[in-house]
Each structure stands twice: as structure tokens, then as C-alpha cells.
Amino acid sequence: MARSLCFMAFAILAMMLFVAYEVQARECKTESNTFPGICITKPPCRKACISEKFTDGHCSKLLRRCLCTKPCVFDEKMIKTGAETLVEEAKTLAAALLEEEIMDN
């Protein structure tokens, strides 16, 4: 009886962990354009990334580059700048709205 109770507790905790993992938003990363040199500590990298309008930044482990992060929009793999990003996001949004309209009918 005690073993089955422990197993059930473990199973519930494992399920909660998997559900919480799937709920997290995807995080897009790109190398900083303004950070100079080798990235050793997080604070200067984070400051450079925030100045580039990202939400956070950290040093890559192997290449020691400053990587800027922000939540992905529409599951895009790459972060682009300027009008190109706006056009792609508008196309993706239009496709999503069209799909929703088709599914409702």
C-alpha cells in the first residue's frame, strides 16, 4: 500500500512537471549586435541586450558570445529587424485569422 502511494505521488509530480514545461513560451535567441568582445559575465551582456529592445541576455557557454533573448512571436525561429519582420508577422497573423475563419465555418 505504501509503495503504491509513493508511486502515485511520483506520477502526479512527474505529470505536473511535464505540463509546466509545455506551458512555457518558446524563447528566441540571437547574438547581440552591440556587445563588444568576449562575454564573461551576464550583467554587461544583459544591459546591451536590453538596449537592443530584448527582454534579457546571457553569455553562451562555449563560444562566450552575448546572446539576447525574448519570447518568440508566432514561433519564428529567427529574429529579424525592421520592415521585414513586420511584413512576416502580418502574413503569419493573416494566415492564422484565415485559418480560424475557415475552422468556424
Swiss-Prot record:
Q: Enumerate the subcellular locations listed in this protein's record, separating them with semicolons.
A: Secreted, Cell wall; Vacuole
Tell me which tissues or organs this protein is expressed in. Flower. Found in petals, stamen and pistils, but not in sepals. In particular, accumulation in a configuration surrounding the inner reproductive whorls.
SUPFAM superfamilies, per the entry: Scorpion toxin-like
One cellular-component annotation, GO: extracellular region
Disulfide-bonded cysteines? 28-72, 39-59, 45-66, 49-68
Can the keyword Disulfide bond be found in this entry's annotation?
yes
Give the matching InterPro entries.
Defensin_plant (IPR008176), Scorpion_toxin-like (IPR003614), Scorpion_toxin-like_sf (IPR036574)
- Annotated signal sequence is 1-25
Where on the tree of life does the source sit, at the highest rank? Eukaryota
- Identify the keywords attached in UniProt to this record, alphabetized: Antimicrobial, Cell wall, Disulfide bond, Fungicide, Plant defense, Secreted, Signal, Vacuole
Q: Which GO terms describe its biological process?
A: defense response; defense response to fungus; killing of cells of another organism
Record-linked PANTHER family: DEFENSIN-LIKE PROTEIN, DEFENSIN-LIKE PROTEIN 1
**Family membership noted in the UniProt record:** Belongs to the DEFL family.
Role noted for this protein: Involved in floral organogenesis. May play a protective role in flowers by protecting the reproductive organs from potential pathogen attack.
Q: What is this protein called?
A: Defensin-like protein
Which organism does this sequence originate in? Nicotiana tabacum
